[in-house]
UniProtKB/Swiss-Prot annotation:
Record-level GO BP terms: translation
Protein name per the record: Large ribosomal subunit protein uL3
Naturally occurring in which organism (per UniProt): Streptomyces coelicolor (strain ATCC BAA-471 / A3(2) / M145)
Cited function: One of the primary rRNA binding proteins, it binds directly near the 3'-end of the 23S rRNA, where it nucleates assembly of the 50S subunit.
GO molecular function: rRNA binding; structural constituent of ribosome
Gene3D superfamilies per UniProt: 3.30.160.810, Translation factors
Length: 214
C-alpha cells in the first residue's frame, strides 16, 4: 500500500549548529529546498499507480532536447535541470505547474534524505569495507592491509560476484533514513535537518517523508 509521501528536491548548503529550547547545541544540515514545480501527475486509472513528478533547478532552454521541451511545455513550466518521481497516495492533490516549497514540511517530522555520497577515489578493503587487516608484526611480511583470501583455487575456479575487494569508493546513491526536521525557514526556503546528510556541499538532495518513521 502506497503511503502519503511528500518530497522536495534541494541543494545541500552545509552544516552548522543551533540552540534548541533546552539550550543544547544541535548539529544541523542546511538544505535549500526548492522551489520545485509539478511536471507530471500519474494516476491509477491511466498509469496503474499513483505518483507525482517534480522538477528543480534552472537550465538554459537551448540545452534541453525536444522531447523534454514538450514535456515541460505540457506542464506550462520553464525547463528544469533535475526531475524525480515520487510514489504517493496523495497524487490527486497535485496539479500541473504547482509550486512546492519548504513549507511542505513541518519541524519535528521524520524524513529520508537521498543524495550521491562524496567520492573517495580508489580505496583498499580496510577503508572501504572495514576489514581488520593482517598482523602488524610477529612475522607479518607486507600483508598488513591486504584482504586475505578471495576464494578457492580450482574449485570454484572463479571469484564470486559481490566479493568485497578494493575499488572505487563513494560517489553512489545513498539514503539516510529517519532524520528529524529541526526547523523550517519558509521565507528563505531552508530546511534545517538534524544530523548529517549524504553528499558534498552544493550537491543535489531529495528530502522525502520517512518510509519507516512514525
Amino acid at each position: 500500500m502506497t503511503k502519503q509521501i511528500k518530497g522536495i528536491l534541494g541543494e545541500k548548503l552545509g552544516m552548522t549548529q543551533v540552540w534548541d529550547e533546552n539550550n543544547r547545541v544541535v548539529p544541523v544540515t542546511v538544505v535549500k529546498a526548492g522551489p520545485n514545480v509539478v511536471t507530471q501527475v500519474r494516476t491509477n486509472d491511466v498509469d496503474g499507480y499513483e505518483s507525482v513528478q517534480i522538477a528543480f533547478g534552472e537550465i538554459d532552454p537551448r540545452k534541453v532536447n525536444k522531447p523534454l521541451k514538450g514535456h515541460f511545455a505540457k506542464a506550462d513550466v520553464t525547463p528544469r535541470r533535475h526531475l524525480v518521481e515520487i510514489r504517493t497516495a496523495a497524487a490527486s492533490e497535485y496539479t500541473l505547474g504547482q509550486e512546492i516549497t519548504a513549507e511542505a514540511f513541518e519541524s519535528g517530522v521524520k524524513v529520508d534524505v537521498t543524495a550521491k555520497s562524496k567520492g573517495k577515489g580508489f580505496a583498499g578493503v580496510m577503508k572501504r569495507h572495514n576489514f581488520k587487516g593482517g598482523k602488524a608484526s610477529h612475522g607479518a611480511h607486507r600483508v598488513h592491509r591486504m584482504p586475505g583470501s578471495i576464494g578457492g583455487c580450482a574449485t570454484p575456479g572463479r571469484v564470486f560476484k559481490g566479493m568485497r575487494m578494493a575499488g572505487r569508493m563513494g560517489n553512489e546513491r545513498v539514503t539516510t533514513q529517519n532524520l528529524t526536521v529541526h526547523a523550517v525557514d519558509a521565507e528563505k526556503g531552508l530546511l534545517l535537518i538534524k544530523g548529517a546528510v549524504p553528499g558534498p556541499n552544493g550537491g543535489l538532495v531529495l528530502v522525502r517523508t520517512a518510509a519507516k518513521g512514525a
